[in-house]
Amino acid sequence: MVHQTIQGTFRQTNLTNESAEYLGKREELRLAEIELMRHRERVAELRRHLPPGPAVEDHKFIEGPVDLDTGDTPTRTVRLSELFTAADRSLVIYHLMYGKRQTKPCPMCTAWIDGLNGVAHHIAQNVDFAIVSAAEPAALRAHARARGWDRLRLLSAGDSTFKYDLGSEDREGKQDSAISVFNRDSHGTVHHFYTAHPWMSPEIKERGIDLLSPIWHVLDLTPQGRGDWYSKLEYPMRSSA
C-alpha cells in the first residue's frame, strides 16, 4: 500500500495491485472532487454576500412544552422575532411537509429531520434552528415523539401565512419542503435572507437541499449510487444474511 500525502496529510490511498486504467480514472475523479469542493465554496460565498433581504411579517407560531414526554399542553404563542436568542445569530427554519392537505408526514422531510435532530446540539453553537409544520401541535409532537426528535424546537404555523409567504404552501393547503434563513436587525425587525427548495429546476428533481442530509452523500460514494431510492417512514426488518 502506498500513502500519498500533501503537507503530511493523507491525500489518497493507493493499493499496490491497482491497474493503470484504475489509477488514471481515480486521478481524474480526484481532480473533479477538488474542483467540486472549490465550486461549492464559490456558491457558498455568493450566498453569504447576498444583500440585505426584505423585512417579513413577525409571524405567530404555536409551541408546546419543551419536553416531548410531558404531553402536548399547555401551548403558547411565540413570534418569529422571539426565536432569535442573540442579535448576531441567524435563524434557520425547516419547513416540514405535514398538515392541511398533507395528511401524513413527508418521508423525505422526516429523513432529513432525523439527521438534523442528531446534530442539533452542534448547530446550536452557531445558529438558532426550528422546525415549522402546518400540522396541529399535537400531531406534530406525536410524529416527533415517534421519531425521537428530542433536540429540536417544534412549531405549528397554525393560522399563520408563514408557509404560504415563504413558498412552502399553496392556496389549497398543499405542502412543500424548504429551508429558510432569517436575520434580525438592530431595531428588532426580521429580514428574510435565503430560502432553498428541493425542486430548483426541471432537471433537478428534489435535489435542491441534498446537502442537508448525509444519506445521499454516502450512497453517492458507492458504485450503485442513489438510484431511485426514496425514504420511507418505516422499513421492513433486514436479515443478517
Question: Which sequence ranges carry the predicted segments?
Answer:
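Thiol-based oxidoreductase modules, predominantly thioredoxin-like and allied folds used
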Residues: 120-139, 150-161
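Non-globular targeting/processing and membrane-anchoring segments
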Residues: 2-91, 96-121, 125, 143-145, ...
